[in-house]
């Protein structure tokens, strides 16, 4: 065999070997296990700033993006109806207190003196009737007065005696004042009226809505001059210090996201990675179930909602930023 033929065969073998090696490499690259990338989103605690008082918005003191402190004035409400109710409640309380004070103080001196005079007059009438009856009785015993006259004198004596007793009881009532039950009832009415005043005043305090936390204004839903229903969230705030990552994890990767386990995620918007710790997981609804297409080799996989807190401060992060978590094969 000539040298040219040997060189030609050698070239064919070399080319075939290179082609085979290339096919092996391509096959490996095509079918090797690949890393799975899960995408989640950053969230933060949201608070609604609302008022217990329905009314017209007087003024909103903040706008979207403002950083405010706990206790800062957020908005105020004008409510003339509530101020009118306060005036009514205060008037009712004054009236109830006056009645309670009168009952507690007892009868006036004039009432007591009048009752005493009536009793003394009835007492004098009773004494006179008693003496008259004694005289008539003596005359009857001596045969001078008739039985009819004696009975009339006795009836007059009995009547004046009962009148004296009734007048004396009224005098005692005037001295003692109202009964304990009347005093308790009057005091209870005063307390109820005071409670109405306190209730209206507590509502009036809520016409000025204050920030419940240190945070950022995420949205303003009503402006000055608009009507606000009771409890309507006029302003929304977010607490950037209370943030977490929410991510949907297929069941087959759940072992990587046990509660308390730490993992790393990449935040494209911040061009940095951050560590997170799983604090909560829960199965998602059937809409998130991955249905198997081949019952012999695969199975339906549930998806789980995982919440994880960042282990470091995420400076300049915003709600809704994506976080990419790589699951190594």
From Swiss-Prot:
Main localization, broad class: membrane
Listed name of the protein: 36 kDa antigen
GO CC, one annotated term: membrane
Subcellular location: Membrane
Keyword Transmembrane included in the entry's annotation: yes
InterPro entries named among the record's database cross-references: CusB_D23
UniProt entry keywords in alphabetical sequence: Membrane, Transmembrane, Transmembrane helix
Superkingdom of origin: Bacteria
Transmembrane region(s): 11-31
Family: Belongs to the membrane fusion protein (MFP) (TC 8.A.1) family.
Topology of this chain in the membrane: Single-pass membrane protein
Species of origin: Helicobacter pylori (strain J99 / ATCC 700824)
Pfam families, per database record: HlyD_D23
């Amino acid at each position: 065999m000539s040298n040219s033929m040997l060189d030609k065969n050698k070239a064919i073998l070399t080319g075939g070997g290179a082609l085979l090696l290339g096919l092996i490499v391509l096959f490996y690259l095509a079918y090797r296990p690949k890393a799975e990338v899960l995408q989640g989103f950053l969230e933060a605690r949201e608070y609604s700033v609302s008022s217990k008082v329905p009314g017209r918005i007087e003024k909103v003191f903040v706008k979207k993006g403002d950083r405010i402190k706990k206790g800062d004035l957020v908005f105020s409400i004008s409510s003339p109806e509530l101020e009118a109710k306060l005036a009514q409640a205060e008037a009712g309380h004054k009236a109830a207190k006056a009645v309670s004070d009168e009952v507690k103080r007892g009868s006036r001196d004039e009432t007591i003196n009048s009752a005493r005079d009536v009793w003394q007059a009835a007492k004098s009438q009773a004494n006179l009737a008693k003496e008259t009856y004694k005289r008539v009785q003596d005359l009857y015993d001596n045969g001078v007065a008739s039985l009819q006259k004696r009975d009339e004198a006795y009836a007059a004596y009995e009547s004046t005696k009962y009148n004296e007793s009734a007048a004396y009881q009224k005098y005692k009532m005037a001295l003692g004042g109202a009964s304990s039950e009347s005093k308790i009832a009057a005091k209870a009415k005063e307390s109820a009226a005071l409670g109405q005043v306190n209730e209206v005043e507590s509502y009036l305090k809520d016409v000025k809505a204050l920030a419940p936390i240190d945070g950022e204004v995420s949205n303003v839903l009503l402006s000055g001059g608009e009507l606000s229903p009771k409890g309507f969230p006029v302003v929304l705030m977010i607490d950037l210090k209370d943030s977490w990552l929410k991510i949907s994890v297929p069941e087959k990767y759940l072992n990587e996201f046990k509660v308390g386990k730490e993992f790393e995620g990449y935040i494209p918007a911040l061009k940095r990675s951050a560590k997170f710790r799983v604090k909560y997981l829960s199965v998602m609804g059937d809409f998130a179930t991955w249905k198997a297409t081949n019952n012999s080799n695969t199975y339906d996989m549930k998806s789980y909602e995982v919440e994880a807190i960042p282990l470091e401060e995420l400076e300049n992060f915003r709600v809704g930023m994506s976080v990419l978590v790589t699951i190594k094969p």
